[in-house]
Amino acid sequence: SFKGQQVHSSAFRTGVEWKGKNVVVVGSNNSAHDICADLWENGANVTMVQRSSTHIARSDTLMDLALGGLYSEAAVKNGVDTDKADLIFASLPYKALPALQIPVYEQMKERDADLYARLEKAGFLLDFGEDGSGLFMKYLRRGSGYYIDVGASELVADGRVKLKTGSIEHVEADGLVMADGTKLKADLIVWATGYGSMNGWIAKLVDQATADKVGKCWGLGSGTNKDPGPWEGELRNMWKPTQQPNLWMQGGNLHQNRHYSLLVALQLKARMEGVPTPVYALAAVHHKA
């Protein structure tokens, strides 16, 4: 019954045409923040709807505290080029990562305390992961629940982008009604509610039976939210043989695609050339979705 326009974040292109209009963006992670910033810069009246807590990491702080020793001009001067940095980063055991990451995010809390205080004052729901291990572990465990801040957090903190937390009750002709009865007028609703799973794409490209055979992709089996156990020891079904012969999964960030694509290519080439490629036994499938 909504009389305005609705789009998923994947279909949003620009805020140019929404100058002076009311726009509600449902979501509070990377896509939602980027879209809110674009809409605000183009003169829209923007409200972000946050339904659950989000981890915020300032880009500059993240690069300095977490990645500066590997990916920076200083690292290059120390002889650490991109290939070496990728190898070092990939060599860290996933089991050891949380203990290594927690102190980094404690430093981040101190350095950016003013931003976090202003966000919380604005009503923003913050978290640093279930165990305080921050962005990287959220990324590896679930691939969601965070925003790398390149400016939009300031817009939320000072109220230029309005914020409403809570669940949505329903959509009406001229906007959204929240569970607490608050009504948000909207000419446009952007649903920044995430993307489908890799399993979902397998089901679309092949069939559901194949998707179920491969099982859940991504995540470590940490037992945290959206990453059910048991512990896997490595990312589920990524860059290695799966339960479906000749179906390989490739994904992740730039570092992972640079580093692991070579290993996938070598495995494929070996099979084409008939070179034996003994590996550990195929991982058991514990989750279908």
Segments (PLM) and residue ranges:
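Flavin (primarily FAD) cofactor-binding/catalytic cores of flavoenzymes
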Residues: 1-52, 59, 95-289
